[in-house]
Amino acid sequence: MSVGPLDPGVAPARLVAMSVDVRSAILIDPAGGLVSASDGDSERARRLAGLAHEMVSAADSAWSGASDALEAQTLGGAIFAVRDARYTLACVARRLALPALVVYDLRQTMLAIGGSAGGAQPGRPGKERSAIREERSPI
């Protein structure tokens, strides 16, 4: 019995269900349009989609070539994104989440929906990017 690809409409909810560290997730198209979200709050999902698209666009501007996996850390948590030519799957995770595990879960979810689990441009190897933002305590 073969199992078909995962419906993109449920991919973010599946990611949140399978990863204890992931708080919220969204799936967007290359233009930043919201495809689906784990959160029932549509305004929050649209905001997260816009921010994820901005993060991916900023990474593309900062480095030559497209990145297939991104990570940004703050004191309050982290945002991760994995993309291919069709979708970007992004999530917000708790602060102490292990990045390699979160990226693994993102890639597995992308594979389940029929994505390439990385490789922003078909036929080109992807690159992972990490930007860590340090915040200093005023004390």
What are these regions (language model features)?
Residues M1-S24, P30-I139:
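Acidic, low-complexity cytosolic segments
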